[in-house]
Amino acid sequence: KLKVNIRKAAREGAELVVLQELHNGLYFCQTEDTSMFDLAETIPGPSTETFGALAKELGIVLVLSLFEKRAPGLYHNTAVVLEKDGTIAGKYRKMHIPDDPAYYEKFYFTPGDLGFEPIDTSVGRLGVLVCWDQWYPEAARLMAMRGAEMLIYPTAIGWESSDTQEEKDR
C-alpha cells in the first residue's frame, strides 16, 4: 500500500514524498520488547535499496524513517533522504529521544550523533528532523541558521490509544 500511495503522489505531481516515522511497520515503542530489535536494518540496506529504486523510477526525492542498526548494540531512529537518482543524499539520526508512557524510545534508540545539518537535494536544502525533535526549538533554529529551506519532521504521533473517542474525533 505504501508504494501504491507513493506512486499516486508522484503521478499527481509530488517531487518530494515524506514517509511517517518508522514507516516499515506499526509504531512499536509502546512496550519494551527485545524481539523488536530484529526489525532494525543497516543503512544502506534493504529499505534504502527498495525505496531508492522507487525514487529513481518516479524521479522523486523520498524521505524514509528507519530503525537503524549501526553496530551491535547501537541503534538509531534515522531519517534517510533519497535523491531522484535513487542515491542516499543524507541522513539524520533523531537527537531527542522520549521516555514517557507509551513512548519508550530510550529502550530502543541511542540519541543521534550527526548534528543538525541540512541535506542538499534537487528540491531544495532540507532540514530533516524526527518527531519529538519538534519540541526543541534549537533544532529548527540550527537547521535554519545553516540554510535549510524547508523543515521536515517524519512523525508517528497521532493520538493515544487511551484517548476517548471524542478526543480522537476532535
State the predicted function of each range.
Residues 3-84, 91, 157-170:
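Cys-nucleophile CN-hydrolase/nitrilase-fold catalytic domain and related Cys-dependent amidase chemistry
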Residues 41, 53, 70-170:
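Active-site catalytic loop in hydrolytic enzyme cores
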